[in-house]
Amino acid sequence: MNVLFEDDDIVVVDKPAGRIVHPAPGHETGSLTEELVRRFPQMANVGSRERPGVVHRLDQETSGVMVFAKTQAAYLNLRKQFESHKTIGKKYLAVLHGAPKERKGTLDGPVGREHLRAITHWEVLAKRGPVSLVEFTIETGRMHQIRIHAAELGCPLVGDRLYGDAAKDRRLRIRPKRQLLHAVELSFLHPSSGRRVTFAAPPPSDLVYAVD
């Protein structure tokens, strides 16, 4: 785990693909929070005991930028921001099967069991044979939002075992081991200063290789 930034209030990390954010049934060890609490013991009492410092999440297979709270005040502030979505900026890079018909566009529709509104903007950055590199910017933070919307575009994420196309995955030269989705940029208002801060993490090698 690479720490991108750390101060008295927050710690920002580049989450590796395959790491769980917090312990869960069947995954009691090896989480990011376990490592963070070892490095910053004060985080053990921030938020809930099961999810210390956690104010948002990424899927286990998704890599990229995450912020954790180091104090209870920062935790409450950031939780409020992530729940309202108004001050949060999120950008992702993904490798898709095929490419959307339009170079850029927006999907605005319900996702998930509760059919909550989800707004996703996309822009095609590059096309490489049977796949494309697409930047997603989301205004909401619904579970599997990008993965669902990409599938609705007819261009599921490469390596997505839930919403993807296993037959197409098998025909690719890269043999994906995970869904190729990376949280490349995260911005929010710093819980103490109130200033907008932005953090970025370069895409990992498997994503780069897929569109090289």
Regions found by a protein language model. Name each.
Residues 1-212:
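RNA pseudouridine synthases
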